[in-house]
């Protein structure tokens, strides 16, 4: 989807806030712990290349989801370690090795396929994934991990790290978290040749379970200034939300009692009122279920009326504002604020999803 620079809808990304958020977390973790910045999914909608360059002096490496995301960073001149968190099949290994990209290997089946396809792993850097209870990818026993590490070394790979991921580190009930932690510790203790790097700490673990940090952390959502738990747990230190979303009024009119607005005529005016049109819609990631939510105009909350369309939404205004008047969808407007978590709560989802759904049709301004 092409970025639409010739309309007023933009996302503003504060790179300094991201740098300060990472620094705040680093102050609360032990010295010598390696920091990976998680910039998958275009840095959660903030711009992977721009964020990675901004954090270059502060972090030891980056985590991405797949090979294409890793190659994007290499092509942008990022020369620090890049770890792919997802599974890369053996037929893509040559690109990974050629670009010094570290891969995750999560099963003995992967080794079997590599051997079947006669793939060598000479020069390949690997982190092994352990499934301690997340249930997605990873090995489940020390025996399996030992066999995998031995097999990888036979094929010429350098096994640098081993890691896991917690399912409930952002929840108040830490029963499942502790079960996973003990599972992982026991598995690590059973390794015959433990890799140099051991990491399990995502954003939530880094800030609420710092006593469980091994020797590396993966900082994702906290880097962008958001609480991993939404609003369930209090942050131990302040963060700055790095992304704001704004647009402008492009049409203002008065409607009369009985007039309807939007697809399905789901909104009927009870009296005469001003309606403003804003050029953002579900194609931009502002989903249809945002009808009834409010945005900010002139420091006042204005309700979204009628269904959100693909490219536009409509809001009830307290008066007739001039065309071009600023509309804030995420961020501050005259001392009032709408957070990404406010939107997530309204949608009954998580703040991660709100950011990741913001499409590339919305230009990012830095």
From Swiss-Prot:
Amino acids binding substrate: 136, 310
One MF annotation (Gene Ontology) recorded for this entry: alanine racemase activity
Family recorded in the similarity comment: Belongs to the alanine racemase family.
Protein name in UniProt: Alanine racemase
HAMAP family (UniProt xref): Ala_racemase
InterPro entries attached to this UniProt entry: Ala_racemase (IPR000821), Ala_racemase/Decarboxylase_C (IPR009006), Ala_racemase_C (IPR011079), Ala_racemase_N (IPR001608), Ala_racemase_pyridoxalP-BS (IPR020622), PLP-binding_barrel (IPR029066)
Positions annotated as active site in the UniProt record: 40, 263
Cofactor or coenzyme needed: pyridoxal 5'-phosphate
Pathway: Amino-acid biosynthesis; D-alanine biosynthesis; D-alanine from L-alanine: step 1/1
Protein keywords: Isomerase, Pyridoxal phosphate
Positions bearing N6-(pyridoxal phosphate)lysine: 40
A Gene Ontology biological process term: D-alanine biosynthetic process
GO cellular component terms attached to this protein's record: cytosol
CDD domains: PLPDE_III_AR
Listed EC numbers: 5.1.1.1
Catalytic activity: L-alanine = D-alanine
Pfam family, one: Ala_racemase_N
Function as written in the Swiss-Prot or TrEMBL entry: Catalyzes the interconversion of L-alanine and D-alanine. May also act on other amino acids.
Native source organism of the sequence: Streptococcus pyogenes serotype M28 (strain MGAS6180)
């Amino acid at each position: 989807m092409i970025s639409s620079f010739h309309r007023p809808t933009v996302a503003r990304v504060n790179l300094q806030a991201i740098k300060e958020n990472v620094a705040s977390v680093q102050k609360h973790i032990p010295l010598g712990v390696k920091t990976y910045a998680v910039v998958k999914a275009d840095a959660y909608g903030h711009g992977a290349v721009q964020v990675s360059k901004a954090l270059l002096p502060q972090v030891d490496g980056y985590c991405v989801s797949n090979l294409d995301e890793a190659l994007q960073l290499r092509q942008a001149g990022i020369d620090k370690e890049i770890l792919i968190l997802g599974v890369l099949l053996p037929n893509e290994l040559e690109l990974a090795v050629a670009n010094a990209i570290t891969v995750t290997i999560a099963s003995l089946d992967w080794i079997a396929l590599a051997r079947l396809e006669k793939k060598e792993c000479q020069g390949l850097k690997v982190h092994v994934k352990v499934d301690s209870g997340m249930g997605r990818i990873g090995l489940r026993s020390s025996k399996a991990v030992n066999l995998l590490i031995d097999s990888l070394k036979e094929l010429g790979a350098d096994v640098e790290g081993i890691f896991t991921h917690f399912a409930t580190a952002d929840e108040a009930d830490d029963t499942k978290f502790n079960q996973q932690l003990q599972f992982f510790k026991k598995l690590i203790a059973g390794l015959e040749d433990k890799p140099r790097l051991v990491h399990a700490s995502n954003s939530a673990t880094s800030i609420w379970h710092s006593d469980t940090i091994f020797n590396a952390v993966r900082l994702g959502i906290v880097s962008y200034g958001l609480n991993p738990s939404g609003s369930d747990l209090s942050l131990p230190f302040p963060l700055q939300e790095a992304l704001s979303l704004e647009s402008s009024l492009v049409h203002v009119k008065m409607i009369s009692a009985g007039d309807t607005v939007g697809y399905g005529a789901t909104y009927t005016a009870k009296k005469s009122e001003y309606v403003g049109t804003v050029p953002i819609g579900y194609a931009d990631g502002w989903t249809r279920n945002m009808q009834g939510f409010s945005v900010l105009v002139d420091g006042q909350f204005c309700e979204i009326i009628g269904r959100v369309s693909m490219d536009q939404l409509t809001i009830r205004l307290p008066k007739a504002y001039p065309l071009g008047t600023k509309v804030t969808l995420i961020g501050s407007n005259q001392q009032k604020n709408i957070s990404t978590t406010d939107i997530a709560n309204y949608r009954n989802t998580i703040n991660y999803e709100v950011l990741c759904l913001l499409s590339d049709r919305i230009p990012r301004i830095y």
